[in-house]
Amino acid sequence: MTELSDDIFAELRKIDTPTITNVVATYPKNPLCLGLYNPWTENWYTDTSIRCLYPELGPTVGYAVTCVYGMPDPNYSGRLSFMDVLDALEAMKKPTILVIQQKWPDEIMKKAGLAGEMMVSSMMAVGCIGMLSNGPSRDVDAIRKLKFQYMLGGVTAGHGEMAVQSINVPVSVGGMDVAPGELIHMDENGAVKFPAHHAPAVVKNAQAMLDDEARRLVMIRKAKTAAEVRAANSGGAYTQKKA
């Protein structure tokens, strides 16, 4: 598994998630886009069901550790526990983001406040910096003070008995398919995933794209006519007016 330098992570944290998506797959005809996925047919970024609870933290980037939570099963429960999840977090390259797919009956899905201050503090002890989940969690104010990012399907105050169903398997959360070890980049706009070995190219191309956009924005903000706006966008991601 690719282990990235601290410098790469530092650069990734300077870049917003939409720019990362632009480079990963959004604009396949742009030479700066790596085209890692078909942008419409593959599930590589999250949808509107995921809410960022602490946008003030800025971009959060880490290696994915995955697990599935659901109702206790008398034929299986007890084989895995949250301690096994912590072991998986500890074994992964750092930093990590825990990606939890919650599988509950419909009547419970919006009421399972899975993680709270105790779980999050335990996760942080083994190098985890954020959690992404399709279901709710809780202890929002306490976790705000920990500078740990929550990307969730919602918030609720309680839960009943829960069980770990699997660890480090492919999961689907908020419309995004995630495999263990993939890199997750997330901020108030949502989350995107990509293979970790592409990170240096993602950083390089994202920086170039931001520089290009900054140059174009200067021209656009000075523009007074549609022709001037069109000229500023020439060669960029947006389609030019047909002759």
Residue spans for each PLM region:
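Extracellular/luminal Protease-associated
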Residues: 87-134
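Buried hydrophobic positions in well-ordered alpha/beta secondary-structure cores of metabolic enzymes
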Residues: 24, 123, 182-184
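Acidic, glycine-rich flexible loop/linker segments
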Residues: 153-229
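Short coil/turn connectors at secondary-structure junctions
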Residues: 61-63, 93-96, 127-129, 145-148, ...
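Generic structural signal for well-ordered, non-membrane alpha-helical segments
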Residues: 13-21, 60, 112, 116, ...
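General beta-strand structural signal in soluble alpha/beta enzymes
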Residues: 33-36, 69, 99-101, 131-135, ...
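Intrinsically disordered, low-complexity regions enriched in acidic/Ser/Thr/Pro/Gln residues
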Residues: 1-92, 97, 212, 217-226, ...
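Ligand/cofactor pocket segment of small-molecule handling proteins
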Residues: 120-157
